Amino acid sequence: MAERTHACGRVTVEAIGQTVQLKGWVQKRRDLGGLIFIDLRDRTGIVQVVFSPETSKEALEVAETIRGEYVLHVEGTVVARGAGAINENMATGQIEVQATKVTVLNAAKTTPIIIADDTDASEDVRLKYRYLDLRRPVMYNTFKMRHDVTKTIRNFLDTEEFLEVETPILTKSTPEGARDYLVPSRVHDGEFYALPQSPQLFKQLLMVGGFERYYQVARCFRDEDLRADRQPEFTQIDIEASFLTQEEILDMMERMMTKVMKDVKGVEISVPFPRMTYADAMARYGSDKPDTRFEMELTDLSEFAAGCGFKVFTGAVENGGQVKAINAKGAASKYSRKDIDALTEFVKVYGAKGLAWLKVEEDGLKGPIAKFFNEEEANVIMTTLEASAGDLLLFVADKKSVVADSLGALRLRLGKELELIDENKFNFLWVTDWPLLEYDEEANRYFAAHHPFTMPFREDVELLETAPEKARAQAYDLVLNGYELGGGSLRIYERDVQEKMFKALGFTQEEAREQFGFLLEAFEYGTPPHGGIALGLDRLVMLLAGRTNLRDTIAFPKTASASCLLTDAPSPVAGAQLEELHLKLNVKE
């Protein structure tokens, strides 16, 4: 078999007159009365191949048997297309290849999906036949971008003197965070490894080990409820460094992302990135990962609501809640009563009891709650919300957390429905000054807002014992277009502070030592101050590639139920395997 001389998408006018050897798949076959045209595709693109009796009767006879997705080896001569046949939409549109010889390397059945960017297949079919789905150019280009992003990050970190170090996949189960994926040990009866949710502890131990600058393109595993931007196994760019301040870490990450955007997308972004405290983000956007590509911020009307004539508003404030609103500028005519009812049902999903609304007309406020406000109160609403004729005002009165969640989600929905979001924008943002702990009323205990190894502000360390809810974290999240791209923090590196943190989380001394004794002991041997960040590679590529589903950036992803339609994983295993592992199943019928 002759070697390939050209990739299909790279045969250009410079090759006119040359004999070329091409290999690829049949994208399309057209029979035009004695002539057969085949679009031959490989990873680089498509080239048109012409079979004619004048050039080769033998090749034409073979071409008559060829169908879509056959794998071919074509030998032929590159010629210029006629003036009327030039296709400006193809990189190879000025030439075609006159086939002198063709070999079928492999035949193909009719594929269950159309191999094209615009396929008609459902996602389940695409995942079942993922190897065919990956042939679509849009998929190849996505994974080429993923490769380019990873390569750019590796090169950047190499220039910053970081070492790429692999950490264990089989590790110890720890109780914090999501559920672990467990792996039974055959050698140690009744004991289990866990797949890592992140390399957090090992990268900190590398800092104890004096490596100073570490990174890893790390595989992580979390047994949690899935959604469109979550997968049970995912990849993160894991970074840790000793002796760097928070400012130095943020600056380095900004330089890294600037290089990624320029090298991969050809987009210049400005630095430093805007910063917003966690409290400010929640107050203004109802989200700890605000999408700042459009306005429509939340406005607090609680002070006004406390003394107004609408009892729903006053009652919410009296019960310790708040009243907030968003102004959908110019949207009054775009939302009917039925449409607003749909918005009401939408906010109920986030815990809101309802959605109050007003439309602004030339002669004042109109809507079911307008009658509860006198002229002065109506003017306060108009002024506070900067409202004018044609605006739609939407209110939620409830607990603070419900108001933030429901209006934050409603803001995003309206931004999409009203086409306020510039899809070509890349708005990076740091969210800083997070609460260290979050209280779970059902569990009746505190949980770490990020993880148990996050350093509190120095002046807040004592609050761990007196008022844990007031302690602030030296933590920072990188947000891009409303998605959390990554989270990081300075880490605890002193044993006494770490023990105070464990105590605030409800660990007894014995539990802390049993779970994390190796880390606590390591902190007694000269641990340097350190910190880092972990960036979600899958999510970053999703955003840069303009995809809406994380599964499109993972070669062989799982479904929303954490199953693989291609391999039928997870699946039962033989009884002998379970016996070797000393396991008995207690499966509910």
From Swiss-Prot:
GO biological-process terms attached to the record: aspartyl-tRNA aminoacylation
Site (Important for tRNA non-discrimination): 84
UniProt-recorded Gene Ontology molecular function terms: aspartate-tRNA ligase activity; aspartate-tRNA(Asn) ligase activity; ATP binding; catalytic activity, acting on a protein; nucleic acid binding; transferase activity
GO CC annotations, alphabetized: cytoplasm
PROSITE patterns xrefs: AA_TRNA_LIGASE_II
Keywords: Aminoacyl-tRNA synthetase, ATP-binding, Cytoplasm, Ligase, Nucleotide-binding, Protein biosynthesis
Family listed: Belongs to the class-II aminoacyl-tRNA synthetase family. Type 1 subfamily.
Protein name: Aspartate--tRNA(Asp/Asn) ligase
Organism: Bacillus cytotoxicus (strain DSM 22905 / CIP 110041 / 391-98 / NVH 391-98)
UniProt lineage: Bacteria, Bacillati, Bacillota, Bacilli, Bacillales
